[in-house]
Amino acid sequence: MKKIPVILSGGTGTRLWPLSRKELPKQFLGVASEKTMIQETVLRLRYMDFSDPIVVCNESYTSIVYEQLRDIQVDSPYVIFEPERRNSGPAVASAAFLAESFDTDSVIVVFPSDHVIRDAKNLAKAVEEGCRLAGLDKMVTLGVKPTYPETGYGYMEIYPESSDNTCYKLKTFVEKPDEKTATALIQKGNYFWSSGIFIFKAKVFLSELEKYSNEIYKNMKKAFSKATRKDHCLRLESESFKKIPFCSIDHAVMEYTDKGMVVPLDAGWSDIGSWHALWDYQDKDSNNNVLLGDVLALDTKESYILGKNRLVVGVGLKDIVIVETEDVVLVANKNRVQDVKKIVEELERKKHPATN
């Protein structure tokens, strides 16, 4: 039974704007370390017994993907290029069709390319348990115990019965709740954050996809069968692909399947999906600030300040995010940074070049 890692790398990372842009989104940036996020994701695979990875990304990122993987001595990954963004459901479907063509009993382990994990060895233990369950035809997701009412994550309710606390049966998904709802979910105690890491047999996923999201299944099957192939590179056929609905893996399958299981992940995980999440992840000074670049802060607490090109000075600030780049300065309340995505949408509507 092959175990094949699938790296999802097609997102645009709009909530980390203005650092993350369409042409160079956060997975290709060194946001949390000197290496880029996709490089860190692939390097974590060293702790696990995997076959060569499958990377799924947009066609526009072709050269970036190959260049960054070559830099870490990954010379021959399988790469699937999507003509357009369609979210994680179709992306995983394309990888599942490819993995099934290698080995009809293969297990795929899906990793977003833009998350950070401090403890790769604990991740490997959770993945090993997930692969055991996947071998029993279960559909597994790794869940993280919530530490605060984050509104940018999906939440998963579990049936609390477990013989050894290594896995739980999945009950329901809750899509990105508001703060009041998130607080209530945490207090109940039987909810996890969805880490975005999924483990299942390719054929089991495709069977469930055909059952619950047939439009994705049938059109991806056509796009895959008509794909252009060269060496380890596969370009999905555009006409069929464009008929595929935009859909997350949660909405496509995980909300409906009766095979869902949750394996707890305690490995210092963060999806770095917002400036608040990045502030939460990084080391702080004695005033709980993250100060990066040419920055001076006076009487400032609980803030994130990044200066890329100029001196940035903060005086008397609390819970503030300041991000200075060559062409944009973002100033936001740290508790409102989820709304950065709305700013990007408005700029895109106005066709402003700052989104590129």
PLM region spans:
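Residue-level signal for inorganic ion chemistry
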Residues: 28, 38, 95, 114, ...
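Short beta-strand segments
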Residues: 7-9, 56, 109-112, 141-145, ...
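Conserved beta-loop-beta/alpha segment of the NTase-like Rossmann-fold superfamily
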Residues: 74-161, 199-200, 206-213
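Left-handed beta-helix
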Residues: 1-2, 203-356
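Conserved N-terminal catalytic core of the sugar/cofactor nucleotidyltransferase
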Residues: 1-7, 14-22, 30-112, 116-121, ...
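Short loop-to-beta-strand entry elements in the cores of soluble alpha/beta enzymes
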Residues: 191-202
